[in-house]
Curated annotation (Swiss-Prot):
Stated family: Belongs to the universal ribosomal protein uL6 family.
Gene name tied to this protein: rplF
Repeat is among the record's keywords: no
The protein, known as: Large ribosomal subunit protein uL6
An example Gene Ontology biological process: cytoplasmic translation
Subunit description: Part of the 50S ribosomal subunit.
Organism (species): Lawsonia intracellularis (strain PHE/MN1-00)
Amino acid sequence: MSRIGKLPIMIPAGVEITFGEKNISIKGPKATLVTPKCELLSYEHKEDKIILTCNFDTRESLAQYGLRRTLLANCIEGVTKGFSKTLEVIGVGYRVSVKGNIVELSVGYSHPVHIELPDGITAKAEGQKLTIMGSDKVLVGEMAARIRRIRKPEPYKGKGIKYESEIIRRKAGKSGGKGKK
């Protein structure tokens, strides 16, 4: 039995939850998110919390138990506080700028790379840092990964685009002519 699934989800003030036939709609001060309902679980809405219960004792329903609780909790956190990921652009001449909903990266290619942000995602550039913000945790993570993939950090000098908290494993360079006679 999932220990995460057993925990009740607290609903903060200002969040409105609607249970539909196949979806759960969460409306908050920042956005409105929709998450799919699982038929293997039952959802109980009591005052300021939601309690999930497992209807069957199958392997699949137990796997969905903790997952659906976490997805629902992430939606509630997203519509109240929001999520953000910060990327660092490291390298000589590497630059990042945001113009509207387009992120422009100059990261060593012969041309600048333009990435259009989807609806619900905003970006802010401060020097060598790019912060991606939004209410959908999955979409924020996907956009950060897509931007990082343009120029991954290389292990010799550490140049590239990395997450703020990421530690790059560095490699030693060439040994410089040892062993030649």
